Amino acid sequence: MSHRNKENMKLIKQIIPIAIIITLMISCASSRIVLSSNADVSKYKYVIFGSESSGDRELDDVTMAVQNQIAETNLKVLSASDISKVLECSDSILTPNIHVTSEKWDGGHTYITVTFYDYNNNQRIAVVKSSGIGMTVSHDQNIALGAIRKELDKLFKDN
C-alpha cells in the first residue's frame, strides 16, 4: 500500500466516527405530557376510538400506529356500538383525538399530539405530545412514534 493510500485510510478512520456522532446528534426526539389540573387519570380504564384524527390523510399510517400504541396500554378498547358496556363504564372512558403532521422534506420534523377527552363530558384530561427529527421523513416518524410510546406508557401502563 502506498504512502498516499495509508494517509487516505487514516483520514477515513478519523472521519467515520465524526460522521456517526453528527448523525446521532441530528436525530432527536422530544415529548411531554400535560394533565388537566383536576384530572385523575387512574380512574380511566377504557378507550373508545372513532373518527378522532386530524391532519394530512397521507399520514393515516402514523395515526393508526399511534392508535395501536394506545391499545397496547392498560386501557381496554371498547366499541361505541357496545351501548350497554359504554353506559355501564361511561365515567371511566377516554376518547383520543390524534393529530399528526410531518414536514415532507428530509431533515424536517414529525409532530404527534394526542388529546384525551372524558367520554361523558368531553373535557380535556391529558395531552401527550412528541416530535422527531431524523435523516429522512420515515426516520422522523419512527422517532416521534418511539417518543409518544414512552409517554403513553408513562401515563397508562401503571394505570
Features from the language model and the residues they span:
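Sec-dependent bacterial lipoprotein signal peptides
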Residues: 1-28
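A structural "domain/chain start" motif
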Residues: 3, 26-75, 158-159
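A short, hydrophobic beta-strand-centered structural micro-motif
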Residues: 49, 79-104, 112-113
